[in-house]
Amino acid sequence: MKTFDELYAELTEKARTRPAGSRTVAELDAGVHAIGKKVLEEAAEAWMAAEHESDEATAEEISQLLYHAQVLMIARGIDLQAVYRHL
């Protein structure tokens, strides 16, 4: 299990080192528009899971939403502190 901060650090490292076959690198290369579409898709899936599926399925969908939101942050050069200032 990892925290939100640990996930961000892991994704930032992947963006920096660009390992072959990395889903994160592929998503970053696709650009902000494509990443934004994934954020919307995952948000809808989290909502549908919350309406119609188990807590476990909902948690999994939310984890995917958080992943794609962080990839979007990295693509835009937004760090965690910039987001935390708005919480």
From Swiss-Prot:
Record-annotated disulphide pairs: none
Entry's family note: Belongs to the PRA-PH family.
Keyword Nucleotide-binding recorded: yes
Species: Beutenbergia cavernae (strain ATCC BAA-8 / DSM 12333 / CCUG 43141 / JCM 11478 / NBRC 16432 / NCIMB 13614 / HKI 0122)
Protein name: Phosphoribosyl-ATP pyrophosphatase
Places the protein is found: Cytoplasm
GO cellular component, one term: cytoplasm
EC number: 3.6.1.31
InterPro entries: HisE, PRib-ATP_PPHydrolase-like
PANTHER family xrefs: HISTIDINE BIOSYNTHESIS BIFUNCTIONAL PROTEIN (PTHR42945), HISTIDINE BIOSYNTHESIS BIFUNCTIONAL PROTEIN HIS7 (PTHR42945:SF1)
Keywords, comma-separated and alphabetical: Amino-acid biosynthesis, ATP-binding, Cytoplasm, Histidine biosynthesis, Hydrolase, Nucleotide-binding
Main localization (coarse): cytoplasm
HAMAP family membership: HisE
GO biological process: L-histidine biosynthetic process
Keyword Hydrolase appears in the UniProt entry: yes
Catalytic activity: 1-(5-phospho-beta-D-ribosyl)-ATP + H2O = 1-(5-phospho-beta-D-ribosyl)-5'-AMP + diphosphate + H(+)
Pathway the protein takes part in: Amino-acid biosynthesis; L-histidine biosynthesis; L-histidine from 5-phospho-alpha-D-ribose 1-diphosphate: step 2/9
GO molecular function terms attached to this record: ATP binding; phosphoribosyl-ATP diphosphatase activity
